[in-house]
Amino acid sequence: MDTVTQQRISKLHPTVREEMVKIINSCNQALQGKAQVRITQGLRTIDEQNKLYALGRTEKGKKVTQAKGGQSIHNYGFAVDICLIIDGKTASWDTAKDWDNDQIADWMECVKIFAQHGWVWGGSWLKFKDMPHFEKKNLTWKQLAKLKLDTSGYVKL
C-alpha cells in the first residue's frame, strides 16, 4: 500500500480505518502486483465538497458530484474514491482492463472485494454513475448529519 493511500485512510472515520486497510490489501493481493489501488479521495471537507459541486454549475468544468457540502458520505469519512496505479507510475480509472491477465477486469476484482466488506460501488448506481466511488453500506448523509461530533470532529455512531 502506498503512502498516499495510508495517509488518506488515516483521515477516514476511525470506525472504518482498519477495515479499509484490509480492503486495500486484499485488492492489491488480488491484482498481483502490476496494478495497485490508490485512494484518491477520502474524507472531504464541506468547503471541498461545495467546490466540487460548483463544477459544471457555477464554475467551468464537468459535473462530478450531485452532493452539496454536508450531503456526501465523504464529508463524514465513510467514502473513498480510488484509481489503479499501474507499474507504480500511471493512474488509471479503466474499469475493463485486466493487467494481471486472470480474465477478470482488475477494477471489478476490487468492486467485489469492497462489496464483501459491506461497501457500495458508485458504478452500480442507476442515475449518477460514479465509477471511482465506494461508500459504506446502510449509511445516509441525512442520518449522519443529525449525529453529534466527537472531540476530533467525527460523527459519533
What is each PLM-predicted segment?
Residues 1-140, 150, 154-156:
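Cell-envelope/glycan interface and biosynthesis
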